[in-house]
């Protein structure tokens, strides 16, 4: 049975974040190909040599460019340097292209640094959606749920977060809704992969539930 507290809070959160959304999704279409998007930074939690770059992709939801990770590392990430959100949402379109060990696409929020943040991801090899927190470089599982994630297909991954409440949606369907308090306070937002996942991202979108200061 659904928790009535969580169901009610998710309705309130949806109303709040719609009012504080970033005006337009970030489609990487004005960024230089072969380089990171302007205002973004990349790295890895753990070890490895991730390769993040803007590339052309004829299948992109908002053509012509995508942000693509084609290297390998424990947990590669790429985050915006100019945004800091405590409560709100983060959303992205992603396509899992290949990977022998993993085929993951995810989003991060309340990102303090490369060792401390929340992450939600969908996995085309495992056909599931998972929620984690990372503290001091160690990733810990909060919950995972089976979900259809066919590879080489564009999906929409969205996370709504307000205080302790977290809701994870894939392609418009809610798969995880719970409370957790491991990572608190404002932080950056971005995208994430795992291991040898080759993943493309497009239409990155975020919003804050806090009203802008006048």
Show the residue positions of the predicted features.
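Short, aromatic/His-centered strand-loop micro-motif at the edge of beta-sheets
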Residues: 135-156
């Amino acid at each position: 049975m659904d928790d009535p507290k969580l169901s009610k809070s998710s309705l309130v959160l949806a109303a709040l974040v719609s009012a504080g959304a970033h005006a337009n999704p970030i489609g990487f279409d004005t960024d230089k190909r072969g380089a990171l998007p302007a205002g973004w930074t990349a790295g890895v939690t753990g070890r490895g040599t991730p390769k993040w770059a803007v590339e052309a992709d004829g299948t992109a939801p908002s053509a012509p460019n995508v942000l693509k990770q084609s290297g390998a590392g424990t947990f590669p990430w790429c985050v915006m340097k100019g945004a800091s959100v405590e409560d709100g949402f983060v959303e992205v379109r992603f396509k899992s292209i290949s990977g022998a060990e993993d085929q993951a696409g995810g989003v991060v929020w309340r990102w303090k640094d490369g060792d401390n943040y929340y992450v939600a991801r969908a996995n085309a090899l495992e056909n599931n959606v998972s929620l984690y927190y990372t503290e001091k470089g160690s990733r810990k599982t909060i919950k995972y749920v089976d979900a259809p994630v066919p590879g080489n297909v564009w999906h929409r991954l969205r996370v709504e977060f307000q205080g302790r409440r977290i809701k994870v949606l894939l392609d418009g369907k809610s798969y995880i809704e719970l409370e957790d308090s491991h990572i608190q306070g404002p932080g950056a937002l971005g995208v994430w992969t795992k291991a040898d996942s080759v993943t493309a991202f497009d239409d990155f979108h975020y919003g804050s539930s806090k009203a802008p200061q006048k």
